[in-house]
Curated annotation (Swiss-Prot):
This is DNA ligase. ATP binds at D259, R266, R281, E311, F351, R428, K434. The keyword Magnesium applies. GO terms for molecular function: ATP binding; DNA binding; DNA ligase (ATP) activity; metal ion binding.
Length: 600
């Protein structure tokens, strides 16, 4: 398959903002895609070479590196390319302009008589970029530059534009996984009504390229039979949120299994024979950070093949008490993991089982999953079943909540024991409800928002970006809707570190998936997720979250404050617009229920 087909579609996709039109055009591209390379095409659309969970190297090509390769490919000096880049602000557009100019000149000089270069294929582009990513050791820099320059030399102007953008991590076509799923269902499944089948398959095996290839070659029937596979992560089940214990019990059917909600790193742990894989909430392979956890699971959880889920918690080695979540960050920074294990020991608290010895447990109710999980974990000091109770009593639920808080947990998770309480991979629903500590605010809980823009500071913070436009995720439209502008809660060190990240993410125009009426000093590609608390949720004409619900404007957080970064969450894992709406309605309900003051 020729790479120019992808480049031409990317050029058309970039000019469209309507999700329906994006989906239709993407489905058209998939119809023209060779079934043998559909997986590679999907990865390229996602802006990657392979799924994150493989732990394979990323391209990691800096702008200087790209400029050098483009210079070699076009015989234009590095200085001239840098000058053009400063003027245009898009290295992909610079590549297009240079190649276009050279192409026009060669046509005039040779009147079309020169021999055309062999067309670039998707296979060639993918394989060479894979070599660029994986090349290491002495001489690897020269190999990378040579490979990249070779591709750019053979590329047409349009191909060069999107090659450079892909390598630079700035594809700009505005397509998320949800839109890809829609297009796959239309192209190979027979229509949008088959989308739930495609999505469930993706939720059970979070490798969209692999799912696309199975669907393209085997059809919708083959996807129906997909089960979890150890080594490929399952997209995690997510919880709704409430602050009224009575309402929680009512939502889950009046009786619940209530777990501690631990303040740790959510880990999905797979065993396949003698291999252990640990995946983060974002489905990244974090096995190397937790070799001790891999050893504990191998030793104390019975079975040859299974997938379990739990929280990895830092603990005090002397008392066994839970330590703050932030201590886990030291494991990521330490070069000597064995030293980190001694300094920051962890325990694992398991709360679910999704697969065991060839059997798909995601389709079984929680009561059956938990019973099996308890039967396979041996008594030990490192791997535990999450502390829990089963109750139908509101007062007992409250008591257990305060017990959890006193022992260092964030709160509790209230889980349905109904016969249909399956593991809803990749979905947020009322089968699980989180009940977290009240932050002494009208907002009953924190929210996780995506940074989509930045504003210059004033006074002491002049010269820095010091306030930030934050957005919630709208899963129905696959877009990010603004909720607030946050400036407080950041330390000076956090702001300094943030300047570097902004430099990598900034863009001149809003990202195609960002819906905003507010215009920041610089737009950002949605990537960073932060935990935010505020005084209350109000309606504001400045913001777009749930703007279709209220004539006066969208929902906004008053007096927002930064709590911490959530590196474990992807932008699509952020708090949804529906959750913000539910929090707002719950807040109104509380206000209405408060007795009014009466004069005597």
């Amino acid at each position: 398959m020729e790479f120019k087909i992808i480049a031409e579609y990317f050029d058309r996709l970039e000019k469209i903002s309507s999700r329906l039109q994006l989906t239709s055009l993407l489905a058209d591209l998939f119809k023209k895609t060779d079934k043998n390379v559909i997986d590679k095409v999907v990865y390229i659309i996602q802006g990657k070479l392979w799924p994150d969970f493989l732990g394979m190297p990323e391209l990691g090509i800096g702008e200087k590196f790209l400029i050098r390769a483009l210079s070699i490919a076009t015989s234009v000096s590095d200085d001239e390319i840098e000058k053009m880049y400063k003027s245009v602000g898009d290295l992909g557009q610079v590549a297009f302009d240079i190649k276009q100019k050279q192409q026009s000149a060669s046509i005039l000089a040779f009147l079309g008589a020169q021999k055309a270069s062999k067309p670039l294929t998707v296979e060639k582009v993918y394989d060479d970029l894979a070599k660029v990513a994986t090349s290491t050791g002495e001489g690897s820099r020269d190999i990378k530059i040579r490979l990249l320059a070779g591709l750019l030399k053979d590329a047409s102007p349009l191909e060069a534009k999107y090659l450079v953008r892909f390598v630079d991590g700035r594809l700009r076509v505005g397509i998320g996984d949800a839109t890809i799923l829609d297009a796959l269902a239309i192209t190979f499944g027979g229509g949008q009504n088959f989308r739930p089948i495609v999505e469930r398959a993706y939720n059970l095996r979070a490798d969209l390229g692999n799912i696309a290839k199975i669907l393209a070659n085997g059809g919708i029937e083959q996807l129906k039979n997909i089960k979890p596979q150890p080594g490929i992560p399952i997209r995690p089940m997510l919880a709704e949120r409430l602050s009224d214990p009575a309402e929680m019990l009512s939502k889950v059917g009046n009786i619940a299994l209530v777990d501690y909600k631990y303040d740790g790193e959510r880990g999905q742990i797979h065993k396949a024979g003698d291999k252990i894989f640990i995946f983060s909430r974002r489905l990244e392979n974090i096995t190397n950070q937790y070799p001790d956890v891999a050893e504990y699971i191998s030793k104390y959880v019975k079975g040859n093949e299974f997938i379990v889920e739990g929280e990895i918690i830092p603990v005090d080695p002397e008392t066994g008490e839970m330590r703050p979540f932030q201590e886990l960050m030291h494991r990521k920074r330490k070069s000597d993991i064995h030293e980190a294990i001694k300094e920051y020991p962890v325990n694992v608290f398991l709360f679910d089982l999704m697969y065991y010895e060839g059997e798909d447990y995601t389709v079984k109710p929680l009561s059956e999953r938990r019973k099996k999980l308890e039967s396979i974990v041996e008594d030990n000091d490192y791997v535990h079943i999450a502390t829990h109770i089963i109750t139908d009593n509101v007062e007992k639920l409250k008591e257990f909540f305060y017990q959890a808080i006193s022992e260092g947990a964030e709160g509790v998770m209230v889980k349905s024991l109904a016969p249909d309480a399956i593991y809803q991979a990749g979905s947020r629903g009322w089968l699980w409800i989180k009940f977290k500590r009240d932050y002494q605010s009208e907002m009953a809980d924190t929210v996780d928002l995506v940074m989509v823009g930045a504003f210059h500071g004033k006074g002491r913070k002049g010269g820095k970006y010091s306030s930030f436009l934050m957005a919630a995720y709208n899963p129905d439209k696959d877009v990010f809707e603004t909720v607030c502008k946050v400036a407080s809660g950041f330390t000076d060190a956090e702001l300094d570190d943030l300047q570097k990240k902004i430099a990598e993410l900034k863009r001149d125009t809003p990202h195609p998936r960002v819906v905003s009426t507010m215009v920041p000093d610089v737009w950002l590609t949605p990537a960073l997720v932060a935990e935010i608390i505020g005084a209350e949720i109000t309606i504001s004409p400045l913001h777009t979250c749930c703007k279709d619900q209220y004539a006066e404007g969208g929902l906004s957080i008053r007096f927002p404050r930064f709590i911490r970064w959530r590196p474990d969450k992807s932008p699509e894992d952020a708090t949804t617009n529906r959750e913000i709406l539910e929090m707002y309605k719950s807040q109104l309900k509380k206000i209405e229920e408060k007795p009014s003051d009466q004069s005597v």
